[in-house]
Curated annotation (Swiss-Prot):
Domain notes: IleRS has two distinct active sites: one for aminoacylation and one for editing. The misactivated valine is translocated from the active site to the editing site, which sterically excludes the correctly activated isoleucine. The single editing site contains two valyl binding pockets, one specific for each substrate (Val-AMP or Val-tRNA(Ile)).
Quaternary structure, from the entry: Monomer.
Main subcellular location: cytoplasm
Official protein name in the record: Isoleucine--tRNA ligase
Keyword flag Transmembrane: no
Catalytic activity: tRNA(Ile) + L-isoleucine + ATP = L-isoleucyl-tRNA(Ile) + AMP + diphosphate
């Protein structure tokens, strides 16, 4: 017989080397959808223990970006791994559909509500626009291989959800957490209405910049703080502002608790006075004030000045010093004029100190009739009058005109103001919500754990939550308020349920169409309907109740996990916590996981202007979704997540390693029937038993990593296994046995059994991450199986068996190390053309006593482990002087090219080639494998 190729067991598989994912994945998606895969998974987990991950709804506007992809893929990996762990883990995706960005898009097309279109028509247009955006985003999410009930998502604009949001608010009200107050908002005096952040543009504007002195009320108390016994002249604290018109509303002076302040005497035109200024700024200040000389009298920390009082510069009252985190020493005086009715920072810090939110300005930007001195003046015209009055009172230390960036109305292009307007709030303290929420944070697991202190600080310091907006497209605050007393209707809670029932049938328009008399009868004239809408953060923050508690898939089970970007401590995690605690006295979640933002290779934020945006659509079309999924899984999401074309190409390389491993496994179990060909683990060749043991140990590690959401560890350990234990060791060693042993021999079937077990386990390991590839592998695995890997659980067939006669795992670790050293020497010899390949080499190993015993254990099978034609083990003491040193102190090597004939079939160089006359080109091992019983292997 001259052609022995037909006697070899050569690998064969339909699993292609190239993934061609960009083209193949869409076909698989189509098949998954047509076969109702998501429903099959649900069916397979009927009555199983539930695991509920609640989807934080992305906003239904624009294309998805890479951050959306990270978020959805992380959720998908969790859902799939929990399903593999036997849980019933439904995934209902959601979208946030109300609010300003959608209004603005619709406004560009149809104009403002009440102009060319009615408010009702405008809402309908918003609804249609949001629905279209949802469709676009849904297609992009599906393309990522995310499994969800895509045909039945939740939308915050679903009639049922809108109704449940109203019901949620009624519970918050019933529990006593709502109150009415005022809050400063961006206000356009030309529009006569509030503006949202998105409607504000910043343009340069000339404004008066003034330094104003507030004289101290209790001079001895102030002097004592600075350690000064007495001072005969005036003492003042100085503020700097570019909005003189807000001074009538001043109610405090804010200093920084950790900022140092100096009491400095300034002499100007022969007159002395002492001023309190930030230490870092006093020199530039006194120079600006035109001082002829100055003397430092003392310094203190801002915290020491708290609650000292100073006289208002032109009204007959005094104001306190308060501490504010917003105070800086970048410019000005280091003291901030505080008017809670005219600034967000002022308002927040004012709430802490219970300051009056004075609002002397009407809708049209004119001071109200009861405003002392300035009644009837427009605020911007009043700047001049305020400056003149300050000069007259001797309180003006400096006045210049400056050019600076200032908020303008995007419609009128005119400067806007901050002014306090009546709003609805959820109170943090009137019913102990703050303390309750802090207690609930303690009961929640935060991943990473720094999330806990972050949200705790926010809850400790946050003001009451303003939940009202003056918008058209939003869930209405369905309240009736008494026209004279401004009190809520006493039956508000039951009235809200009746309104909710209508909204459930007709959507939010039902509220605006409702005539008060339909619900209030004769009382209708005494009450007015509230026209405000809810903050969209209330919409999304109440979905634990409006969606999860309402949908049958969740069966009333508590939510296990919220997972969003780290900005959501302030956003969705916070709003959900507040509403749930206000409604039910407990947090809505057991665990909260946050991931970092995506940045480019240089750590910069993604930005179209910088040109560093990586669009997920581009990645899936070019590389495939599995590459994007592998990048997400392999990246430690606890910090910023770096992505670039180069990084994605590295993910593609890692993917190829996994794919090549899978291909090798499939090609070598081709024709293997697990029913008839399986070798029991205890009957396997020792090396095969070892690799099954390694796979079993690895599975434990992977399952633990999945359970703890450490997906980067899953990919690291998997890559290590594919590259080191399998690629560089096991798969390399078994090729000879797999290809040359008798087809049905124990030597070969043992090896195939191990490969089969690893394949069954590995396809499940990768399924949550490389979903498309896992499905492809699953369909090519031998043996009876269900249609999809995704309905399976983790593989139970990996038995960690070690026989008494077995070589220990430490032993195999030593062999791995020895083989690595031998490989280096052979590679070197190949480079220097001493040998053509490892089978041309004959190697002598000089080992110390312990290692010698280990190596000699294997007998003649050591050569199969080292992939050489011949190996000899000799005592280290006998090593010649030219023996090659290795990184193992216990081992030296020598290598020579074999002079023996090469076997045509197995390519080993053996002395016995041609010993059997009928097969002159074969070694006796190959003859046994072709014609005899076949070789037996014990170790490798």
């Amino acid at each position: 017989m001259s052609d022995y190729k037909s006697t070899l067991n050569l690998p064969e598989t339909e699993f292609p080397m190239r993934g061609n994912l960009a083209n193949r994945e869409p076909e698989m998606l189509k098949s998954w959808t047509e076969n109702g895969l998501y429903q099959q998974i649900r069916e397979s987990r009927k009555d199983a223990k539930p695991f509920i991950l609640h989807d934080g709804p992305p906003y239904a506007n624009g294309d998805i970006h890479i951050g959306h992809s990270v978020n959805k893929i992380l959720k998908d990996i969790i859902i799939k791994s929990k399903t593999m762990s036997g849980f019933d883990a439904p995934y209902i995706p959601g979208w946030d559909c109300h609010g300003l960005p959608i209004e603005l898009k619709v406004e560009q097309k149809v104009g403002k509500p009440g102009h060319k279109v009615t408010a009702a028509e405008f809402r309908q247009k918003c609804r249609e626009y949001a629905a279209k955006q949802v469709d676009g985003q849904r297609d992009d999410f599906i393309r990522l291989g995310v499994f969800a009930d895509w045909q039945n998502p939740y939308l915050t604009m679903d009639y049922s959800t809108e109704a449940n949001i109203v019901r949620s608010l009624s519970k918050v009200i019933d529990n006593g957490h709502l109150h009415k107050g005022v809050k400063p908002v961006h206000w356009c005096t030309d529009c006569g209405s509030a503006l949202a952040e998105a409607e504000v543009e910043y343009e340069d504007k000339m404004s008066p910049a003034i330094d104003v002195a507030f004289t101290v009320v209790d001079k001895p108390a102030l002097l004592a703080k600075f350690g000064v016994n007495e001072y005969p002249h005036n003492i003042s604290m100085v503020i700097w502002t570019t909005t003189p018109w807000t001074l009538p509303a001043n109610r405090a002076l804010a200093v920084g608790a950790n900022v140092e302040y100096t009491l400095v005497e300034m002499v100007k035109e022969g007159q002395a006075q002492a001023l309190v200024l930030a230490t870092d700024l006093y020199e530039s200040c006194v120079e600006r004030f035109g001082a002829e000389s100055h003397t430092v009298l003392g310094t203190v920390a801002g915290s020491d000045l708290e609650l000292l009082r100073f006289n208002h510069p032109f009204y007959d009252f005094d104001v306190p010093v308060i501490l504010g985190d917003h105070v800086t020493v970048d410019s000005g005086t280091g003291v901030v004029h505080t008017a809670p009715g005219h600034g967000q920072d002022d308002f927040v810090v004012g709430q802490k100190y219970g300051l009056e939110v004075a609002n002397p300005v009407g809708d049209n930007g004119v001071y109200k009739p009861d405003t002392e001195i300035f009644a009837g003046l427009h605020v911007f015209k009043a700047n001049k009058n305020v400056v003149e009055l300050l000069e007259e009172k001797g309180a003006l230390l400096n006045h210049v005109q400056i050019k600076h960036s200032y908020p303008h109305c995007w419609r009128h292009k005119t400067p806007i103001i901050f002014r306090a307007t009546p709003q609805w709030f959820i109170s943090m303290d009137q019913k102990g919500l703050r303390q309750q929420a802090l207690g609930e944070i303690e009961q929640t697991q935060w991943i990473p754990d720094w999330g806990q202190s972050r949200i705790e600080k926010m809850v400790e310091n946050r003001p009451d939550w303003c939940i009202s907006r003056q918008r058209t497209w939003g869930v209405p605050i369905t309240l009736f308020v008494h026209r004279e007393t401004e009190e809520l209707h006493p039956d508000s809670v039951s009235l809200m349920e009746r309104v909710a029932a209508r909204i459930e049938q007709e959507g939010i328009q039902a509220w605006w169409d409702l005539d008060a008399s339909e619900l209030l009868g004769d009382e209708a004239d005494q009450y007015r309907k509230v026209t405000d809408t809810l903050d969209v953060w209330y919409d999304s923050g109440s979905t634990f109740s409006s969606v999860v508690a309402a949908r049958p898939e969740f069966n009333g089970h508590p939510i296990d996990l919220y997972l969003e970007g780290s900005d959501q401590h302030r956003g969705w995690f916070m709003s959900s916590l507040m509403i749930s605690t206000a409604m039910n006295g407990k947090a809505p979640y057991k665990q909260v996981l946050t991931h970092g933002f995506t940045v480019d290779g240089q750590g910069r934020k993604m930005s179209k202007s910088v040109g560093n945006v990586i669009a997920p659509q581009h990645v899936t079309n070019k590389l495939g979704a599995d590459i994007l999924r592998l990048w997400v899984a392999a990246t430690d999401y606890s910090g910023e997540m770096t992505v670039s074309d180069q990084i994605l190409n590295r993910s593609a390389d890692a993917y190829r390693r996994i794919r090549n491993t899978a291909r090798f496994l499939l090609a070598n179990i081709n024709g293997f029937n697990p029913e008839t060909d399986m070798v029991a683990v205890e009957d396997m060749v020792a090396l095969d038993r070892w690799v099954v043991r390694r796979a079993a140990a690895l599975q434990q590690e992977l399952l633990e990593a999945y359970d703890q959401y450490n997906f980067h560890l899953v990919t690291q350990k998997l890559m290590q296994f594919c590259s080191v234990e399998l690629g560089s060791f096991y798969l390399d060693i078994i090729k000879d046995r797999q290809y040359t042993a008798k087809e049905d021999s124990n030597a070969r079937r043992s090896c195939q059994s191990a490969l089969y077990l690893i394949s069954e386990a590995m396809v499940r390991w990768i399924a949550p991450i490389l979903s498309f590839t896992a499905d492809e592998i699953w369909k090519l695995l031998p043996g009876e199986r269900g249609e999809y890997v995704f309905t399976e659980t983790w593989y139970q067939g990996l038995q960690s068996v070690a026989l008494e006669s077995d070589l220990s795992d430490e032993y195999w670790d030593q062999l791995l190390a020895v083989r690595a050293e031998v490989n280096k020497v052979i590679e070197n010899a190949r480079r220097e053309k001493q040998v053509g390949g490892s089978l041309e080499a004959e190697v002598t190993l000089y080992a110390d006593e312990a290692l010698q015993a280990v190596l000699e254990n294997l007998g003649d099978e050591l050569r199969f482990v080292l992939l050489t034609s011949k190996t000899e083990v000799v005592a280290l003491a006998q090593a010649p002087s030219d023996a090659i040193e290795t990184e193992l102190a216990s081992l030296k090597l020598s290598l020579k090219k074999s002079e023996a004939e090469k076997c045509e079939r197995c390519w080993h160089h053996r002395e016995d080639v041609g010993a059997v006359a009928e097969h002159p080109t074969l070694c006796t091992r190959c003859v046994t494998n072709i014609e005899g019983e076949g070789e037996t292997r014990q170790f490798a």
